[in-house]
């Protein structure tokens, strides 16, 4: 049986974390990038993680953050996985004694093809839509057919996913993990519990 893993990213409140966990999310994402409307500080992140049930992974998202600040956050917040969304290289990403996921902003097939060689120590790659000035969470999607034949390092599909299109996305790409933020929001930084539940329910149906 294939299990489609789900991550709800951009969690900013206890209520949204609880809704994601209750719906069956495998992971929640906390954004530590102050340029994002979904950013959280250490105090809020600690409250959110303390309220999560066991076996829900916590992913910390960073964008071109300093190593010093990353270490400070990791020392105070129980983070299971780090997700790098900026211009970090493999040497930078692997230094924090945590598994890491590297986001790849996809423009062409070569971005996908070369990613594993560029980030050999990544636990997984996250393929997201390219935007010239934003580092994810844009609501844009890329050409999913570029992933149809990909068989490299484990990977996560992101970029413009919604409860309505995640089924199609998984069927086209063969994704075994999906990541959503804006597609399940009521407004920037605030999740819609019904959309969260619908997104995860669709992924679960595809897991058969």
UniProtKB/Swiss-Prot annotation:
It holds the Pfam family PRAI. Pathway: Amino-acid biosynthesis; L-tryptophan biosynthesis; L-tryptophan from chorismate: step 3/5. The keyword Metal-binding does not apply. Transmembrane segments: none annotated. The keyword Cytoplasm does not apply. Signal peptide: none annotated. Its EC number is 5.3.1.24. It catalyses: N-(5-phospho-beta-D-ribosyl)anthranilate = 1-(2-carboxyphenylamino)-1-deoxy-D-ribulose 5-phosphate. It comes from the Bacteria. One of its GO terms (molecular function) is phosphoribosylanthranilate isomerase activity. InterPro entries: Aldolase_TIM (IPR013785), PRAI_dom (IPR001240), RibuloseP-bd_barrel (IPR011060), TrpF_fam (IPR044643). Keywords: Amino-acid biosynthesis, Aromatic amino acid biosynthesis, Isomerase, Tryptophan biosynthesis. GO terms for biological process: L-tryptophan biosynthetic process. Belongs to the TrpF family. PANTHER family: N-(5'-PHOSPHORIBOSYL)ANTHRANILATE ISOMERASE. NCBIfam families: PRK01222.1-4. This is N-(5'-phosphoribosyl)anthranilate isomerase.
């Amino acid at each position: 049986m294939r299990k489609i893993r789900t991550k709800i990213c951009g969690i900013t409140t206890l209520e949204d974390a609880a809704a994601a966990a209750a719906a069956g999310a495998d992971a929640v994402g906390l954004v530590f990038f102050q340029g994002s409307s979904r950013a959280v500080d250490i105090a809020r992140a600690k409250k959110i993680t303390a309220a999560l049930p066991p076996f829900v992974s916590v992913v910390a998202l960073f964008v071109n953050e300093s190593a010093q600040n990353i270490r400070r956050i990791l020392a105070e917040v129980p983070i299971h996985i780090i997700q790098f969304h900026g211009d970090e290289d493999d040497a930078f990403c692997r230094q924090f004694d945590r598994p890491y996921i590297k986001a790849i902003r996809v423009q062409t097939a070569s971005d996908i093809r070369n990613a594993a060689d560029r980030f050999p120590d990544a636990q997984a790659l996250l393929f997201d839509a390219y935007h010239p000035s934003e580092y994810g969470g844009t609501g844009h999607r890329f050409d999913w057919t570029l992933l149809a034949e990909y068989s490299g390092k484990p990977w996560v599909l992101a970029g413009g996913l919604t409860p309505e299109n995640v089924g199609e996305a998984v069927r086209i790409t063969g994704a075994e993990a999906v990541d959503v933020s804006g597609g399940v929001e009521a407004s920037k930084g605030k999740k819609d519990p019904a959309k969260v539940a619908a997104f995860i329910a669709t992924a679960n149906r595809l897991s058969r």
